[in-house]
Structure formats: C-alpha cells, structure tokens
C-alpha cells in the first residue's frame, strides 16, 4: 500500500506546484500589462489652458484656434551661470516650469527632488528643458543659484534657475502661468508668491498641463504627458 500511496502524493504535489507556477505567471503578466497601460497617455492630445481655474480646452494642435490661444510672453531673466534667459532660450523646446526660493525650509526641497526625477528621466533629451523662477530674487543672486545648482546636481543649460526683476517674475507667475490656487483673492506685488505647482509648456509656449510638484503620482503623470507631447510635435 505504501508503494502505491507515495506516487499518488507526488503526483498531487506536482499538480499543486504546477498550478502555483501558472498562477504566478498570470499575475506577472497582469502586472506588466497594468504598468504598460499606466505609461500610455490619457488622451489623444493634451488639453490647453488659459486661465486660473485651469479649465481644459480641447483644441486640435496646429489649428488656427491653437495659434491664437494664450501663450507665455517673452521675458528677460538671469540664470545660475549669469546668462540672460529669454523665450528664445526655449525655442522648439518643451519646458517644465516651477517657482521656488533657495532658502525655503519646507516644500521647495521636495519640489526640487521631484524635479530632479524629471531631469534624470530626460537628461539626454535635447527637446526638454526645466525653468525654475526664484520668488525671492533679491536674495537669490546668481552666485546663490549657482551654489544651489551645485548642491543638488542641477545640470547647467538643462535646468535654468532664474532670478531677475521681482515684478516681472510675479507677473509671469500670476498673470501668465496662473500658478496660485487661491482663486477669488486678489494679490499684489507685496503678497508672497509661492506654489507647489509644476507646469508643462509646449514648443509653442502654450500651457498643456499643471501638476502637484509634491505628489509622486502627479510627477509620474507629468513624465507620461511629456512623452505624449513629444509625439504630438513630431
């Protein structure tokens, strides 16, 4: 009886092992498929934005409506190398934009660390640049920005940290990038500008996305949207 019983046990055991291997394989395939889906764009074309509520406008890229849509105006600021930075610096570039200050003890460091992820993801991509505006330009001189860049591994000419005229920077942030969320509360130059938002700007200077610079899933979506925008411009 024992000689007959042991083979049966081995057969049952082999069937169970085979079942567990198949189950693990199926789970692995499902997980990989889930990851693949998450890396695709949400829509055929990213929306366009032109005001503080960030209501999406579904416009066909290259259309007359797109050409007449809100654009970020020209500016003249100075980066960590002491170079003058204007819109010409970003001609034919996709740009990720934010506002920060080097002495920020809280969220700015988290924002910088998340922006570093963007820098690393597109480090060798000549189409993608990063632009960070100091909201304390009287403190964040060229030398201070240079030290900050060195401290956090910011790549010169890939990621521009800029200082300049406070009024110009605040006007860009509030009137053109629409970065502050406290709608309904008028602000003037004396009111401090600070936001955790990242913005995605296309090659034609249009706002194509807004993202929480402190949120991991939002940063992941930004990376996906940058890749979608690159395909759109081909």
Give short role names for the model-derived ranges:
Residues 112-172:
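Structural microenvironment flanking redox-active thiols in thiol-disulfide oxidoreductases
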Residues 2-74:
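N-terminal targeting signals for export/organelle localization
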């Amino acid at each position: 009886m024992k000689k007959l019983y042991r083979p049966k046990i081995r057969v049952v055991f082999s069937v169970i092992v085979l079942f567990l291997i198949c189950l693990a394989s199926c789970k692995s395939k499902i997980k990989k498929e889930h990851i693949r889906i998450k890396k695709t764009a949400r829509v055929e074309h990213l929306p366009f934005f032109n005001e503080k509520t960030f209501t999406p406008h579904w416009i066909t890229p290259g259309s007359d409506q797109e050409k007449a849509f809100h654009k970020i105006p020209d500016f003249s600021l100075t980066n960590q190398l002491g170079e003058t930075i204007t819109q010409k610096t970003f001609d034919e570039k996709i740009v990720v934009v934010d506002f920060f200050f080097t002495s920020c003890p809280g969220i700015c460091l988290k924002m910088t660390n998340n922006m570093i992820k963007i820098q690393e993801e597109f480090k060798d991509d000549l189409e993608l640049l990063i632009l960070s505006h100091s909201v304390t330009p009287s403190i964040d001189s060229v030398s201070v920005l240079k030290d900050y860049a060195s401290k956090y591994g910011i790549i010169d000419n890939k990621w521009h940290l800029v200082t300049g005229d406070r009024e110009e920077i605040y006007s860009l942030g509030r009137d053109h990038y629409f970065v502050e969320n406290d709608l309904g509360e008028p602000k003037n130059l004396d009111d401090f500008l600070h936001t955790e938002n990242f913005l995605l700007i296309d090659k034609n200077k249009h706002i194509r996305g807004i993202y929480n610079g402190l949120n991991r899933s939002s940063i992941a979506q930004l990376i996906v949207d940058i890749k979608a925008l690159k395909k759109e411009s081909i």
